[in-house]
Amino acid sequence: MTPTVWYYVRDLDASRRFYRETLGFEEDAVDFDERWSHLRRGAMEVGLSEGEPQEDGAVAHVDVDDVKSEAERLRAEGVEVGVVVEIPQGVMRILDVYDPDGNRIQLAQEL
């Protein structure tokens, strides 16, 4: 599992061009209906989702086998977590987790 940094971008098409043409990333997945793209360059992976950019910038995206069990485990340990969200069309489940300084990390499970 490779960590992926996700950015919310206002214009997915412009951002896709920037990462491919300007920074040399290769796009390995895109969903025009859900408005997201996944790109990689070497060991670096970047995900782009169309939406309003977040105040805190990028989100570290970490793949896990079972988001629901991770949510239960982390809550039991007293870690601040959000709610498990299933992406429409059953593509993946995500969970926002916060480190001791309030930095957001997103756990994700492909379905």
Could you say what each language-model-derived stretch is?
Residues 15-22, 74, 102:
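Conserved active-site tyrosine of GNAT-family acetyltransferases
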Residues 26-58, 104-109:
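Conserved short beta-strand elements that form part of the metal-binding/catalytic scaffold
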